[in-house]
C-alpha cells in the first residue's frame, strides 16, 4: 500500500532539517519579535502534526498488511461473500493510507515555509481585528484554523486590497470591514529571513527579491507575489472562455496554472486535475511547467500537443508528413499554401462549402423492400432534417427511420430489411464516399485546386491536417472528449483558426486561452488576434502588459528591436546587454566559450544559447559539446534541465534563463521585420544578463 520510499520520507526530511538547523539563519532584515514567536509556535505545532501524521501512516500500513496477510492465509476457507467484503475493506484501508500519506507530505512542505503573509481584518460587527496567516496550504491544529489557503476568500484581501476599507466575497455573502495590517514574510527552512510591513498589495521590495532569484529547471509557483491584475484572472470563476494576451515575461502561463489550482479548490466537487488538460507547444515546455500544480498541492494535469490530437484522430486513416520549419524551407509554393490555410478567410471558405454539403454529397433514390417503399424526396427531407449531424450519422438515423416506418406499416407481418442493409443501400447513394474525397472536392469546387498537394500517397502536409480533420468532423464525426472540463491553450498565436475550430468540436468545455501575438515564430501564419476574438465572440479578453522576467535594461533593449508599446518593465535594474563584435567565426566561438566559463563561475543556474534555427543550434552544439556539458533542445526533446542549453528561438518560447547568449546577430541572419520579432523573443528569454555576438555587420534591427 504505502511504499518504503514514502515511509522513509520523514527520516530523510528530518535529517535535512537537522542539517539546516545547524546553519545560521539569514539576518537580512530584522523581523518583528511577535512574528518570530508566532513562527516558533507554528513550527512546534507542525512538527507535532507531522509526528501524528507519521504515526497514522504507520498504523494504517500495519492494518493493511494484517488484513492482506489474513486474506492470503485463509483464502481457501473464506466464502465468496466474505472475500468480497474483505477486498472492499482492503480498498478502503488503502484509500485512507493514500490520504494519510498525502496529508503528511503536505505538512512536510509546510514545515519549510508555512506561510508568506499576515493580514489583520476588522469586520464591521467586531471591536478588535482578527489576524489571518496565508500560506500555500491551510493548516488546522486541535480544531483551530491557523493558516489559510492562498485560494480562500479571505486571502483575496491580501492580493487586492490596501490598508483601509476592504471586503471580500465569502460563501455566506459579502463581508466588509477594514484592513488594518498587512505583513509579508520570506520563510525558508522554517526560519524568518525577513518580514516587512506593507500598505499596498505586494510590497515592491519582496517582488524585487523574488524576481532577482536565479531560474531553475522547473517553473515555480508565484503565490507570494501575485499581482492584482493577475489575481483577477486567477479568481475568475464565471468566464466560459478567457483569452489572455500577455507580453513576454508577464507570467501568463503561471497565472493560467494558478487559475486551475484555484478552480479545483473552489469547485472540488465537480473539477479535479483529471478533468483539466493543457495544449502546449512541445514536450520541453510541458516538462518546464510540470512542477507548478504539484507545488500547489494539486495533481499534475494532462499535457498534449496539436500533433498528439491529430495522430489520435487520424490513426489508420491517413499519414501525416513531418512538420517543416518555415525558417529552414525555401519553397515559395509551399509557403503560399501554408499562409493561405492559416487565415480566417480559409475557415470561412470551408464553412461556406460545408453549408451546402447536402447537395454536394448525397443523391438519394427510392428505397424499396418487398412491398415497402421510402421515396427519394422523403429520404432527402430526412437527410436535410439531420443537418446538425455528420453525414455518416445522418445515414444511420435515416436507416433507423426507414425501419421504423416500414415496421409501423407492417400490418401483414411481412419480412423487414435489416437496418444494416438499409444503411448499406443509403451509403451507396453518396456521391462522395469518404472525407478525403470530400476534402479534395472542396478545393476543386472553390477553384483553388493548386492549394492542395499530397507529398506522397495517403499522406497530408501538416497544413492540411486540421482542415482535413474538420472535414472528417462533417463527414464521419469526431469523438468528443467528455472527461476534460477545462482546457488551457498556451501559445495561442501559434495556432490557426481551423485548428481552433477543430478544438472547439472536440472539447466543448471551459477554456483559458493565452499567448502573445507579438511572439509569432511561423513566418507563414497570417492570422491575427482579431481573428481569434472573432472566433470567440463571447469570450472575456484580458491584457497583461507588465513584464516581470527581465531587468529594466533587457526589456528596454528588446523594445528598441520590436516596439511593443504596451510592454511595461518592472523597475529591477541590472547590466546593460552586451553586444560583442568578433572578427571571424573562430573568434565568435572563443567569445561564447569565454562567456560560458564566466557563467560557470557565477551564481546563475541556467544559460540559454539561442540561435535563429534548429540547424544552427545543432551546428553550435556539435562544437561546444566537445568542451562543455551542454543540452540541445530540439523538437524531440522531452525535458528542460538546468545548466547550459542550446536551442532555436522557436523552441525557446515560454522558457526563461538567468543568462542568454544570442550568436550571429548580423545583417545576413537578422534583417527583416519578421526577424525583429524573432530577436525580440530571444532577448526576452533572459532574466538577468544578455549577450549578443556577431561577425561582419551588426544587424540593422539593433539600434546602438
Regions of interest found by a model, annotated:
Residues 1-223, 227, 231-235, 699:
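Extended, charged low-complexity regulatory segments
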Residues 238-242:
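Pre-Walker A (Motif I) flank of P-loop NTPase domains
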Residues 244-246:
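Hydrophobic anchor at the beta1->P-loop junction of P-loop NTPases
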Residues 252-253:
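Conserved lysine of the Walker
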Residues 264-487, 494-502, 510:
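Alpha-helical nucleic-acid-binding subdomain
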Residues 269-270, 274, 283-291, 295-299, ...:
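Conserved helicase motor core of SF1/SF2 NTP-dependent helicases
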Amino acid at each position: 500500500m504505502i511504499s518504503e520510499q514514502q515511509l522513509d520520507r520523514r527520516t530523510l526530511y528530518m535529517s535535512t532539517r537537522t542539517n539546516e538547523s545547524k546553519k545560521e539563519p539569514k539576518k537580512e532584515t530584522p523581523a518583528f519579535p511577535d512574528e518570530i514567536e508566532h513562527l516558533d509556535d507554528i513550527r512546534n505545532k507542525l512538527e507535532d502534526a507531522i509526528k501524528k501524521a507519521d504515526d497514522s501512516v504507520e498504523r494504517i500500513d500495519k492494518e493493511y498488511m494484517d488484513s492482506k496477510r489474513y486474506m492470503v492465509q485463509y483464502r481457501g476457507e473464506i466464502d465468496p461473500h466474505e472475500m468480497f467484503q474483505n477486498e472492499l475493506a482492503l480498498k478502503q484501508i488503502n484509500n485512507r493510507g493514500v490520504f494519510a500519506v498525502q496529508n503528511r507530505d503536505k505538512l512536510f512542505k509546510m514545515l519549510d515555509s508555512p506561510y508568506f503573509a499576515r493580514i489583520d481584518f476588522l469586520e464591521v460587527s467586531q471591536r478588535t481585528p482578527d489576524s489571518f496567516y496565508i500560506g500555500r496550504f491551510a493548516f488546522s491544529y486541535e480544531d483551530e484554523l491557523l493558516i489559510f489557503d492562498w485560494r480562500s476568500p479571505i486571502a483575496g484581501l491580501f492580493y487586492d486590497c490596501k490598508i483601509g476599507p476592504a471586503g471580500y466575497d465569502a460563501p455566506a455573502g459579502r463581508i466588509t470591514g477594514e484592513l488594518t495590517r498587512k505583513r509579508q514574510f520570506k520563510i525558508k527552512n522554517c526560519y524568518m529571513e525577513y518580514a516587512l510591513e506593507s500598505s499596498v498589495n505586494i510590497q515592491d521590495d519582496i517582488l524585487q527579491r523574488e524576481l532577482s532569484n536565479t531560474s531553475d529547471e522547473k517553473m515555480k509557483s508565484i503565490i507570494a507575489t501575485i499581482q492584482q491584475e493577475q489575481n483577477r484572472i486567477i479568481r475568475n470563476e464565471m468566464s466560459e472562455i478567457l483569452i489572455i494576451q500577455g507580453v513576454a515575461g508577464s507570467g501568463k502561463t503561471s497565472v493560467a496554472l494558478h487559475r486551475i489550482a484555484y478552480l479545483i479548490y473552489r469547485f472540488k466537487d465537480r473539477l479535479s486535475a483529471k478533468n483539466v488538460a493543457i495544449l502546449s507547444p512541445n514536450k520541453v515546455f510541458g516538462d518546464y511547467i510540470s512542477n507548478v500544480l504539484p507545488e500547489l498541492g494539486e495533481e499534475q494535469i494532462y499535457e498534449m500537443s496539436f500533433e498528439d490530437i491529430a495522430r489520435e484522430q487520424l490513426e489508420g486513416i491517413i499519414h501525416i508528413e513531418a512538420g517543416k520549419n518555415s525558417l529552414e524551407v525555401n519553397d515559395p509554393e509551399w509557403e503560399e499554401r501554408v499562409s493561405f490555410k492559416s487565415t480566417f478567410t480559409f475557415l470561412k471558405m470551408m464553412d461556406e462549402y460545408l453549408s451546402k454539403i447536402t447537395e454536394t454529397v448525397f443523391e438519394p433514390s427510392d428505397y424499396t423492400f418487398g412491398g415497402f417503399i421510402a421515396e427519394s424526396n422523403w429520404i432527402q427531407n430526412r437527410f436535410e432534417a439531420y443537418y446538425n449531424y455528420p453525414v455518416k450519422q445522418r445515414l444511420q438515423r435515416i436507416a433507423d427511420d426507414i425501419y421504423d416506418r416500414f415496421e409501423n406499416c407492417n400490418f401483414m407481418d411481412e419480412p423487414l430489411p435489416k437496418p444494416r442493409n438499409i444503411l448499406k443501400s443509403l451509403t451507396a447513394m453518396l456521391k462522395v464516399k469518404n472525407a478525403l474525397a470530400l476534402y479534395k472536392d472542396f478545393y476543386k469546387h472553390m477553384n483553388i485546386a493548386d492549394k492542395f498537394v499530397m507529398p506522397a500517397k495517403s499522406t497530408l502536409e501538416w497544413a492540411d491536417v486540421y482542415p482535413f480533420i474538420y472535414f472528417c468532423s462533417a463527414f464521419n464525426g469526431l469523438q468528443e472528449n467528455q472527461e476534460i472540463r477545462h482546457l488551457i491553450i498556451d501559445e495561442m498565436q501559434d495556432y490557426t483558426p481551423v485548428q481552433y475550430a477543430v478544438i472547439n468540436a472536440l472539447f466543448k468545455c471551459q477554456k483559458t486561452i493565452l499567448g502573445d501575438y507579438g511572439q509569432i515564430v511561423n513566418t507563414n501564419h497570417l492570422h491575427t488576434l482579431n481573428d481569434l476574438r472573432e472566433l470567440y465572440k463571447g469570450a472575456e479578453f484580458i491584457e497583461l502588459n507588465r513584464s516581470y522576467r527581465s531587468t529594466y535594461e533587457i526589456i528596454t533593449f528588446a523594445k528598441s528591436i520590436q516596439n511593443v508599446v504596451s510592454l511595461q518593465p518592472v523597475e529591477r535594474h541590472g547590466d546593460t546587454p552586451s553586444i560583442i563584435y568578433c572578427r571571424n567565426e573562430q573568434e565568435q566561438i572563443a567569445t561564447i566559450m569565454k562567456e560560458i566559463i564566466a557563467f560557470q563561475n557565477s551564481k546563475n543556474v541556467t544559460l540559454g544559447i539561442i540561435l535563429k534555427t534548429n540547424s544552427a543550434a545543432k551546428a553550435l552544439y556539435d562544437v561546444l559539446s566537445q568542451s562543455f556539458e551542454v543540452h540541445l533542445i530540439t523538437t524531440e526533446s522531452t525535458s528542460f534541465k538546468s545548466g547550459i542549453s542550446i536551442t532555436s528561438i522557436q523552441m525557446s518560447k515560454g522558457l526563461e534563463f538567468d543568462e542568454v547568449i544570442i550568436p550571429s546577430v548580423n545583417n545576413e541572419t537578422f534583417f527583416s521585420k519578421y526577424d525583429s520579432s524573432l530577436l525580440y523573443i530571444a532577448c526576452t528569454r533572459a532574466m538577468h544578463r544578455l549577450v549578443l555576438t556577431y561577425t561582419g555587420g551588426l544587424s540593422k534591427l539593433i539600434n546602438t
